[in-house]
Amino acid sequence: DPLNEERRANRYGFGL
């Protein structure tokens, strides 16, 4: 899921 990927990215600090 793209939303899950976005949450994952935010967790890494990409801040999508």
Curated annotation (Swiss-Prot):
Keywords: Amidation, Cleavage on pair of basic residues, Neuropeptide, Secreted. It is found in: Secreted. GO terms for biological process: neuropeptide signaling pathway. Brain, subesophageal ganglion, retrocerebral complex, thoracico-abdominal ganglion, peripheral neurosecretory system and intestine. It comes from the Eukaryota. The modification Leucine amide is found at residue 16. One of its GO terms (cellular component) is extracellular region. May act as a neurotransmitter or neuromodulator and play a role in the integration of information within the brain. May be involved in the control of visceral muscles due to its ability to behave as potent inhibitors of peristaltic movements. May also fulfill a neurohormonal role on muscles of the gut and heart. Belongs to the allatostatin family. This is Callatostatin-1.
